[in-house]
């Protein structure tokens, strides 16, 4: 698992209060991990802060699973 993937998982566990075993790449923030729309926005903001990047709203809307978050960050974090 990449360093980015591990950080993403840690942020999700901390912010959503879920078990690390629940945070799989296929897991949906809302359907599987119990996040509401505000939680999802807060996750995106935390990813931006942790990785020092800006995620445009139109792209943030497409990040709905753990795997999508990891893939986006691995592409955009230098």
From Swiss-Prot:
Could you tell me which residue ranges the Carrier domain spans? 2-77
Top-rank taxon, per record: Bacteria
**Pathway info:** Lipid metabolism; fatty acid biosynthesis
For this UniProt entry, what is the primary localization, expressed as one broad class? cytoplasm
Spell out the InterPro entries in the cross-references: ACP, ACP-like_sf, PP-bd_ACP, Ppantetheine_attach_site
Q: What residues bear O-(pantetheine 4'-phosphoryl)serine in this entry?
A: 37
Q: Which SUPFAM superfamilies match?
A: ACP-like (SSF47336)
Question: What cellular component terms from Gene Ontology apply here?
Answer: cytosol; membrane
Keyword annotations for this protein, in alphabetical order, are: Cytoplasm, Fatty acid biosynthesis, Fatty acid metabolism, Lipid biosynthesis, Lipid metabolism, Phosphopantetheine, Phosphoprotein
The biological process GO terms on file are: lipid A biosynthetic process
Task: List the subcellular locations.
Answer: Cytoplasm
PTM description: 4'-phosphopantetheine is transferred from CoA to a specific serine of apo-ACP by AcpS. This modification is essential for activity because fatty acids are bound in thioester linkage to the sulfhydryl of the prosthetic group.
Q: Which Gene Ontology MF annotations are present?
A: acyl binding; acyl carrier activity
Q: Which family does it belong to?
A: Belongs to the acyl carrier protein (ACP) family.
Q: What does this protein do?
A: Carrier of the growing fatty acid chain in fatty acid biosynthesis.
Its name, as the record gives it, is: Acyl carrier protein
Gene that this polypeptide is encoded by? acpP
